[in-house]
């Protein structure tokens, strides 16, 4: 049976109380990957996958999930500023559907609006060279996406969200 694909808050009801999550920033050429610790407080970068064919990309993601013993995925969904979904969001949903056919780990979709831009500004502020930014931007965007999702889930648990 394929994995569930749900908005983050709904997906969280299908994840065990503890267990890490894999966060993904899906680009056309790369996939930024981050993971959380088991109590879901902190996101850290893992790697940037150079996209090849879906099966190869998915195999690497599933290997990371197995190595880290995670309980689900958080996939950044690129929503337009007006709240609509354009071609990138549709492509992300298609990727999620294809990944869901290969795993039972629930997939939570999280609004990633402006995540890459925010990370780019942060890296520029840290005086990271353009070449180095290009190497790390997607992994850092995955960290940003996953940490935002973790913070939202923490706020819901404490009644602040």
UniProtKB/Swiss-Prot annotation:
Gene3D superfamilies noted in UniProt: YqgF/RNase H-like domain
Locations listed in the record: Cytoplasm
GO cellular component, one term: cytoplasm
Domain of life where this protein originates: Bacteria
Keyword terms, alphabetized: Cytoplasm, Hydrolase, Nuclease, Ribosome biogenesis
E.C. no: 3.1.-.-
Pfam family, one: RuvX
Class of enzymatic activity (EC top level): hydrolase
InterPro entries on file: RNaseH-like_sf (IPR012337), YqgF (IPR005227), YqgF/RNaseH-like_dom (IPR006641), YqgF/RNaseH-like_dom_sf (IPR037027)
Primary localisation category: cytoplasm
MF (Gene Ontology): nuclease activity
Family: Belongs to the YqgF nuclease family.
Role noted for this protein: Could be a nuclease involved in processing of the 5'-end of pre-16S rRNA.
Protein name, per record: Putative pre-16S rRNA nuclease
Organism: Bradyrhizobium diazoefficiens (strain JCM 10833 / BCRC 13528 / IAM 13628 / NBRC 14792 / USDA 110)
């Amino acid at each position: 049976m394929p994995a569930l694909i749900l908005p983050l808050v709904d997906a969280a009801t299908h994840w065990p109380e503890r267990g890490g999550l894999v966060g993904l920033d899906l680009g056309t050429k790369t996939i930024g990957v981050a993971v959380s610790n088991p109590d879901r407080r902190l996101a850290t970068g893992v790697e940037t996958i150079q996209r090849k064919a879906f099966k190869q990309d998915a195999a690497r993601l599933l290997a990371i999930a197995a190595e880290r013993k995670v309980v689900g995925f958080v996939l950044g969904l690129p929503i337009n500023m007006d709240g609509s979904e354009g071609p990138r969001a549709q492509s992300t949903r298609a990727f999620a559907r294809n990944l869901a056919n290969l795993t039972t780990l629930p997939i939570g979709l999280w609004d990633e609006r402006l995540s890459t831009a925010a990370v780019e500004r942060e890296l520029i502020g840290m005086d990271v060279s353009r070449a180095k930014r290009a190497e790390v931007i997607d992994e850092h965007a995955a960290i940003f996406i996953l940490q935002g999702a973790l913070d939202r889930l923490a706020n819901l648990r404490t009644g602040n969200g």
